[in-house]
Amino acid sequence: KRSLRDLGIPVNQIIPEGGSLKYLKDLPRAWFNIVPYREVGLMTAIFLEKKYGMPYVSVTPMGILDTAEFIAQMEKLVNAWASVLSKEKVNYISYIKNQTQFV
């Protein structure tokens, strides 16, 4: 959650944490889904991708390499939306370096 905030990526919902039936209708509003643990949520992400065309990131951000890959995949998806929304593309390389340099 902190990394997403640092990168300027707004969070629609965190399921199942704090999730309720009232807010499930808002799931399709997300630009993409994050599945940090494949054991929990992967089937939902696959369903949402098939039904609504919502891509997902399923890399567990543990360790230097996987954290860098996780952020790089999010950068790709955010930049895909940037072109649709006429916004400037993002570059998370400096964030990746900062997060992995002193480990």
Swiss-Prot record:
It is found in: Plastid, Chloroplast. SUPFAM superfamilies: Helical backbone' metal receptor. GO terms for cellular component: chloroplast. It catalyses: chlorophyllide a + oxidized 2[4Fe-4S]-[ferredoxin] + 2 ADP + 2 phosphate = protochlorophyllide a + reduced 2[4Fe-4S]-[ferredoxin] + 2 ATP + 2 H2O. Binds 1 [4Fe-4S] cluster per heterodimer. The cluster is bound at the heterodimer interface by residues from both subunits. Its EC number is 1.3.7.7. GO terms for biological process: light-independent chlorophyll biosynthetic process; photosynthesis. Its main location: plastid. Keywords: 4Fe-4S, ATP-binding, Chlorophyll biosynthesis, Chloroplast, Iron, Iron-sulfur, Metal-binding, Nucleotide-binding, Oxidoreductase, Photosynthesis, Plastid. It is an enzyme of class 1 (oxidoreductase). Protochlorophyllide reductase is composed of three subunits; ChlL, ChlN and ChlB. Forms a heterotetramer of two ChlB and two ChlN subunits. Component of the dark-operative protochlorophyllide reductase (DPOR) that uses Mg-ATP and reduced ferredoxin to reduce ring D of protochlorophyllide (Pchlide) to form chlorophyllide a (Chlide). This reaction is light-independent. The NB-protein (ChlN-ChlB) is the catalytic component of the complex. Belongs to the ChlB/BchB/BchZ family. This is Light-independent protochlorophyllide reductase subunit B. It comes from Cibotium schiedei.
